[in-house]
């Protein structure tokens, strides 16, 4: 399966959870920006989810296309956020929406970040044999 979600990719990542102390105990929470990014990803992914979740090993290919600004279309984005942090939030959302039973099924992964004329996230999933 493959699809493109035309959207401005979120730059906030799963690593940006916050902590506060309540009654002497640490409580972790998601700031509003992270909650909004998660909701945006879930909404876009929901319309693309497979009829039944993957339950076998898969390859996941993701191309993050960020608004190019002053950069050339197709130029690699060698700035933050890091690909591993972007992927964590995306794969968590894909699990929540029902792409697979668990993201541990992603056994091969290719991730790229580019500056692009048309921003969005390209995703391809293939079952491994």
Describe the function of each predicted region:
Residues 1-129:
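Acidic, proline/glycine-enriched N-terminal capping motif
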């Amino acid at each position: 399966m493959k699809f493109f979600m035309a959207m401005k990719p979120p730059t906030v990542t799963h690593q940006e959870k916050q902590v506060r102390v309540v009654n002497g105990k640490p409580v972790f929470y998601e700031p509003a920006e992270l909650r909004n990014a998660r909701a945006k990803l879930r909404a876009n992914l929901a319309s693309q989810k497979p009829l039944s979740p993957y339950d076998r090993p898969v390859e996941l290919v993701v191309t993050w296309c960020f608004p190019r600004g002053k950069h050339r279309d197709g130029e690699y984005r060698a700035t933050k956020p890091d690909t591993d942090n972007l992927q964590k939030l995306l794969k968590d959302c894909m699990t929540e929406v029902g792409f697979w039973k668990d993201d541990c099924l992603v056994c091969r992964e290719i991730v790229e970040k580019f500056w692009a004329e048309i921003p969005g996230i390209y995703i391809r999933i293939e079952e491994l044999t």
